[in-house]
Design a protein with these regions (language model features):
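Acidic-aromatic substrate-binding/catalytic surfaces of carbohydrate-active enzymes
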Residues: 23-27, 93, 97-100, 401-519, ...
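Loop-rich catalytic cores of soluble enzymes, especially ATP-dependent carboxylate-amine ligases
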Residues: 138-204, 210-217, 228-229, 268, ...
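Short helix/loop capping segments that flank catalytic or ligand/cofactor-binding pockets
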Residues: 149-150, 181-184, 217-219, 403-406, ...
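Beta-strand-rich recognition/accessory modules
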Residues: 379, 384-385, 389, 502-544, ...
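A contiguous, surface-exposed recognition patch within enzymatic or periplasmic domains that forms
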Residues: 439-503, 589-662
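Catalytic alpha-helical scaffold of carbohydrate-active enzymes acting on polysaccharides/glycoconjugates
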Residues: 1-115, 122-181, 188-203, 228-244, ...
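Active-site and substrate-binding clefts of carbohydrate-active enzymes
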Residues: 2-31, 38-40, 157-162, 166-170, ...
């Protein structure tokens, strides 16, 4: 009775993540893993590293890179997109280019021609098969859940399957979920018992595990278990000594064995990803159904990975921006490299890790989007970027690139400082998440009982994290996108706190509804909405919003007809700053330690000084009643627990309305010493 153990690790860090994150991962995970592997040349393993991570290691830890080269005889290197895109989310031409780039890198540095591909986040879509075949790929890694979702028998997921698209075949290896949750979290005895379940007389059964290398040292409490308590070394010794287990690479097993059956996979990722991509109400309902009826889990699934583009509009915007730029196929190596880097997947979704909630990841994506834009001509363009059936209007003048959405309240969706490769509109709307309900139900004394786990030499995975907070938080959500030049009709008695928490009453229908485009020229955009003010008596009201995009300046003219002095007009901007503690508002700074830090100013101007960017942003207007300023913070989960993350600053310019109201808001970009750029 024998089992073929196919063990693989996937290692990746987001493009341009902080150096200390890379270095910590190298010291706590990658380096000790390969140092232990070097002690056992007969222990074979399959490995996937994203290209950007390999490059970082090559440049910053030559010793580790050389060790990986020395071990190449016992390692099978898997390929993928060089900068770790979700392959189904990028155009075919970029898919082939990114895989080819990593193939060549592996051949050059490790003298292997990859036959296997690590499927980023195991996001399967049949549309990728033709491109994979053109790159020489013979098999990919998915989850057993992919096969379960296609109707495969649960007791038959112990080898590889084959699938096809237009007659092009592809091998499919399903990762065993039980092993994925066991290694390296269960005791050695429990793990070995699971492996023995796969034993078969002819030795053709495979125990398949291919998962994050960061589980070995980076995930909470794993460094102590895996290396200090020598779980990994003991596991290798125990496995090699077990005559019923034969350690193989995926290529060896693929070459020696026939597929189990033909299968056709649905468009799906691993089960948890389907849960995460649901909107909060559906996600909460699915969670309750699974808890009540675990026997139905085979027939239940969440949404597809691409649903993140509808769940988080900021994710959709980034993805559609690089789709737009890819279509141009500008013939420049620098342009294409920037484009491929922008396609890194981490920023586009959210599960256990920060993802879309991490401003630095969004900054990195926009850095490369803007690098591409800088190589294109100045001027204006009209295009449906986000593919919602409504055009966006792009203006590139001087050092500013501005994009306005006609559908979403005529808001400014993107505001790029071209010289700095920085998007001031890289804000994030406050979304409701399923796990927010868990935070609400817990108190500061709630601590997960891990004694039983410790007694069994098991450790909890990040999926078992307790979401507790050490101080009271306020869960507040936004019903409109937090971008800029947003039009509100509000009460005369609106307060700063109501604005901050977005629980003020909205009387108008202008903030998130479509505007008609009356005129668009090289530097001007005229918008109009025939809407209303909705109260005891409804008023048909027209709001005209005219943009003038000058060199390093934006003028916004507002005309509101048939309004009422019973209400105030609130004009809202939301701006993103890379280092909020280095930003002042008319000389006052926000407290970055508080969930809500608020400032109320009575002035006709607002001077924002950003020491980090070495820029000053000046808003001026007439007849202002007051200015509201508040931090825009999100509540999200990560591998460490609950994060309160600054996503920007909300600024509200408040005016007393009249029957025929007119005002102008000017936004000036200046150097920090206040001279015009």
């Amino acid at each position: 009775m024998k089992t073929a153990l196919l063990l693989g690790i996937h290692c990746h860090q987001p493009i341009d993540n902080f150096n200390y994150v890379f270095d910590d991962a190298i010291e706590k995970s990658y380096k000790p893993f390969f140092e232990i592997l070097a002690k056992f040349p007969e222990f074979k393993i399959s490995v996937h590293f994203s290209g950007s991570l390999l490059e970082y290691i090559r440049k910053n830890d030559k010793k580790l890179f050389c060790l990986m080269q020395e071990l190449s005889d016992q390692i099978e290197f898997f390929t993928g997109g060089f900068y770790e895109p979700v392959l189904a989310s990028i155009p075919s031409i970029d898919r082939v280019a990114q895989i080819t780039k990593l193939n060549r890198y592996i051949k050059k540095h490790f003298n292997q021609t990859p036959k296997g591909l690590w499927l980023t986040e195991r996001v399967w879509d049949n549309s990728i098969i033709m491109d994979l075949k053109s790159c020489g790929i013979e098999y990919v890694i998915v989850d057993d859940y992919h096969l379960k979702a296609s109707g495969a028998k649960l007791d038959n997921l112990n080898g590889y399957f084959t699938t096809e698209e237009s007659g092009e075949q592809m091998g499919v290896f399903p990762i065993n979920q039980e092993l994925r949750y066991a290694i390296p979290f269960y005791s050695l005895e429990k793990t070995q018992d699971i492996l023995h379940k796969f034993s078969q007389e002819d030795g053709k059964n495979a125990a398949i595990i291919f998962d994050d290398g960061e589980k070995f040292g980076i995930w909470p409490k794993t460094y102590e278990t895996v290396y200090e308590k020598k779980w990994l070394e003991k596991f290798i010794i125990q496995t090699l000594a077990d005559e019923t287990i034969e350690v193989q690479t995926f290529e060896e097993f693929y070459t020696k064995n026939k597929p189990i059956a033909l299968t056709y996979l649905p468009t799906v990722s691993y089960f948890e990803m389907g849960e995460w991509s649901l909107n909060s109400s559906d996600g909460f309902e699915l969670e309750n159904i699974i808890q009540a009826h675990p026997e139905l889990s085979k027939f239940l699934r969440g949404s597809t990975w691409k649903n993140f583009f509808t769940k988080y509009q900021e994710s959709n915007w980034i993805q559609k921006r690089y789709i737009e730029l890819s279509k141009k196929q500008y013939d420049s190596k620098f342009y294409k490299e920037a484009l491929y880097k922008a396609q890194c997947n981490d920023v586009l979704w959210h599960g256990v890790f920060g993802g879309i909630y991490l401003p630095n990841l969004r900054d990195n994506a926009y850095r490369y989007i803007i690098e591409c834009e800088k190589q294109l001509d100045q001027g204006h363009d009209i295009i449906d970027i986000d593919m919602n059936g409504y055009n966006e209007y792009k203006f590139k003048n001087g050092q500013l690139l501005s994009i306005v959405s006609s559908k979403q309240g005529g808001q400014i969706f993107e505001l790029d400082l071209l010289k700095h490769n920085f998007n001031l509109q890289n804000t994030l709307t406050r979304y409701e998440e399923v796990y927010h309900h868990k935070i609400e139900l817990e108190d500061s004394e709630t601590v997960k009982d891990t004694k039983t786990l410790e007694e069994d030499d098991d450790i909890a995975t990040i999926h078992d994290n307790t979401l507790s907070v050490d101080k009271e938080i306020s869960l507040d959500y936004d019903w409109y996108l937090k971008k800029s030049a947003i039009d509100h009709i509000v009460s005369n008695e609106i307060t700063l706190e109501e604005f901050a928490k977005n629980n003020f009453r909205e009387y108008g229908d202008f903030a998130n509804q479509a505007f008609e485009v009356l005129k668009c020229s090289k530097k001007k955009l005229h918008l109009q909405r025939d809407g209303g003010i909705y109260d005891v008596q409804n008023l048909q009201t027209t709001l005209c919003k005219n943009y003038h995009f000058k060199k390093n300046k934006i003028e916004v003219d507002i005309d509101i007809d048939n309004a009422s002095s019973k209400y105030n007009y609130l004009h809202e901007w939301n701006l993103h700053f890379a280092s909020l503690q280095e930003v002042s508002f008319n000389g006052v700074t926000l407290d970055t330690q508080e969930q809500y830090s608020m400032i109320e100013i009575i002035s006709d101007s607002l001077i924002i000084k950003d020491k980090y960017l070495d820029k000053t942003f000046v808003f001026t207007s007439k007849n202002l009643s007051k200015i509201f300023i508040t931090s825009l913070n999100s509540i999200s989960q990560s591998e460490k627990g609950v994060d309160i993350t600054n996503q920007g600053v909300s600024i509200g310019f408040l005016y007393n309305l009249s029957s025929n109201f007119t005002t102008q808001i000017d936004f000036d970009l200046k150097k920090r010493e206040d001279s015009i750029v």
